[in-house]
């Protein structure tokens, strides 16, 4: 399928909307009321620090809602206002934040249910309005919704669209797209649908395995079993690793994406030499600015004096998880929570360790005066960050801890 031609045709349709509906001013007023925080603004203006009693909060200098997320949420609000009576669906969570998604449910926006691993689009009828989330949607989903005669509101982040353009360039020149990402993540599912031949690698370890195969060969069956859910149909590592292009899920760890790109470039250089490199390797910078800014701010924060780190964001948020990784790698006691309700009375906290289920930690706040580092993922409103900080102050300064 010519995905580029389909996308162009869809964008020219009267049923396709990507620029809102002219209600920006009113919607931004509503969003400011629901999601902004006067306390967080004060902390920003106070050099990202705030003290109450025995607690000093240090905020990362870049955190929370990014432009792409704010744009997606605003478009969803505009859609409800512009279509007050129509049935509105969204193909997935608008962003990975439970409070924002709950707000959309309260606005009578339906979420497409997943049944036996597949989305049930049978509930969508002609004339319904369907929102595509910030992560985007697969070509198959867009085609299905277009064929049904739905009004499509596309809130896909432009940074994600940039990655799609990159893999389409790979496809046009018969390059295999090496996608650094999580093969089940909505964004990577969408990106791979625009690619031709592709392989998804999760991390540097998997990338090294692929590069070793390129240089030394190996067991094809073992390779295909290792990546059984992470490649295009009919993928053959003996034929499809000769010309490679690099792309990434925009929320992955920036430093690892760069390392993976460099590793593949070096591998192809060894395999084919400098004069042939450009015939076998291509790379475009598709690292999201907002992801990079938040990770850089976290790298700075972990170098400061911090007793405990709190990372706020949806548990299924990839960019939030990578912020957590930065803190853990520095050896800081770090707690990933999705709301203030995870901070329990009696100095307890429900949190999600990396690659584990939610667990409860007792005595998580140390005795005496403490410095708590705080950051949040790109899908987390300031209001949620404020609520978490207020709970920390409440627990620590209310005489609960001695």
Swiss-Prot record:
Q: What protein name applies here?
A: 4-hydroxy-3-methylbut-2-enyl diphosphate reductase
Which Pfam families does the UniProt record give? LYTB (PF02401)
In UniProt terms, what function does this protein have? Catalyzes the conversion of 1-hydroxy-2-methyl-2-(E)-butenyl 4-diphosphate (HMBPP) into a mixture of isopentenyl diphosphate (IPP) and dimethylallyl diphosphate (DMAPP). Acts in the terminal step of the DOXP/MEP pathway for isoprenoid precursor biosynthesis.
Give the residues the record marks as binding [4Fe-4S] cluster: 66, 157, 288
> What does the record say about how the cofactor binds?
Binds 1 [4Fe-4S] cluster per subunit.
- InterPro entries with a match to the protein in the record: LytB/IspH
Q: Which GO terms describe its biological process?
A: dimethylallyl diphosphate biosynthetic process; isopentenyl diphosphate biosynthetic process, methylerythritol 4-phosphate pathway; terpenoid biosynthetic process
Q: What is its EC number?
A: 1.17.7.4
Give the enzyme class.
Answer: oxidoreductase
């Amino acid at each position: 399928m010519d995905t580029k031609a389909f996308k162009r045709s869809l964008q020219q349709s009267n049923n396709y909307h990507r620029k809102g509906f002219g209600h920006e001013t009113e919607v931004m007023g509503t969003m400011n009321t629901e999601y902004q925080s006067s306390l967080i603004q004060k902390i920003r203006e106070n050099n990202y620090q705030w003290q109450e009693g025995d607690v000093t909060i240090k905020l990362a200098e870049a955190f929370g809602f990014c432009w792409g997320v704010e744009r997606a949420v605003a478009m969803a609000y505009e859609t409800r206002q512009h279509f007050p009576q129509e049935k509105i669906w969204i193909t997935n969570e608008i962003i990975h934040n439970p409070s924002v998604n709950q707000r959309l449910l309260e606005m009578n926006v339906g979420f497409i249910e997943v049944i036996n691993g597949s989305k049930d689009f049978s509930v969508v009828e002609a004339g319904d309005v369907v929102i595509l989330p910030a992560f985007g949607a697969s070509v198959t989903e867009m085609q299905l919704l277009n064929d049904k005669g739905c009004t499509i509101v596309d809130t896909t982040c432009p940074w994600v669209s940039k990655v799609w353009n990159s893999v389409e360039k790979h496809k046009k020149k018969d390059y295999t797209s090496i996608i650094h990402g999580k093969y089940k993540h909505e964004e990577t599912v969408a990106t791979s649908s625009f690619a031709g031949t592709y392989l998804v690698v999760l991390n540097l370890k998997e990338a090294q395995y692929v590069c070793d195969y390129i240089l030394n060969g190996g067991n094809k069956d073992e390779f295909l079993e290792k990546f059984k859910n992470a490649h295009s149909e009919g993928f053959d590592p003996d034929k499809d690793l000769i010309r490679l292009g690099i792309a990434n899920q925009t929320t992955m760890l920036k430093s690892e994406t760069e390392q993976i790109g460099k590793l593949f470039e070096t591998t192809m250089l060894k395999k084919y030499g400098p004069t042939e490199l450009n015939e076998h390797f291509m790379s475009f910078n598709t690292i999201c600015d907002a992801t990079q800014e938040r990770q850089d701010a976290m790298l700075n924060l972990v170098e400061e004096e911090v007793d405990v780190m709190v990372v706020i964001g949806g548990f299924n948020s990839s960019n939030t998880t990578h912020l957590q990784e930065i803190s853990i790698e520095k050896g800081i006691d770090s707690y990933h929570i999705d709301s203030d309700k995870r901070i329990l009375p009696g100095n307890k906290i429900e949190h999600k360790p990396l690659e584990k289920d939610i667990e409860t930690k007792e005595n998580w706040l140390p005795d005496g005066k403490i410095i708590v580092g705080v950051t949040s993922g790109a899908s987390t409103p300031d209001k949620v960050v404020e609520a978490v900080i207020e709970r920390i102050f409440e627990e620590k300064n209310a005489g609960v801890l001695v």
